[in-house]
A protein has these predicted regions:
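N-terminal low-complexity, intrinsically disordered tails enriched in Ser/Pro/Gly
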Residues: 1-77
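Short glycine-/polar-rich loops that comprise or flank the Walker A/P-loop
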Residues: 79-82
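Conserved small/polar residues in nucleotide/adenosyl-binding loops
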Residues: 89-91
Length: 92
């Protein structure tokens, strides 16, 4: 998900911004609505995942709420509340 290395590790606010950009990039216009994806997967480097592991559920809920608010502000339509998951595969 992140193409550059963060010297101090990725921060949750950076993840939130990137997810919102992904939402914007993958919108689909229908006749009267603009739909956006409702499922998002975050890939983290092992060190970053280790830092967030203890509050992964809370962070996922916060990121979901951020995406929901972003969709509302931009008048996007979602089929369900956004779901944010984390892929536990190593990313280098």
């Amino acid at each position: 998900m992140f193409s550059r290395a963060f010297s101090s590790g990725v921060q949750p606010v950076e993840i939130a911004r990137k997810l919102a950009k992904e939402m914007d990039a993958h919108k689909t216009a229908s006749v009267s609505r603009v739909y956006v994806p409702n499922e998002y997967t975050v890939w983290l480097a092992p060190d970053d995942y280790a830092r967030f592991k203890d509050y992964e559920t809370s962070l996922a809920q916060e990121l979901s709420a951020h995406l929901l608010e972003h969709a509302r502000r931009n008048e996007f339509d979602l089929l369900t509340r956004p779901v944010v998951g984390q892929d536990r595969k190593s990313v280098v």
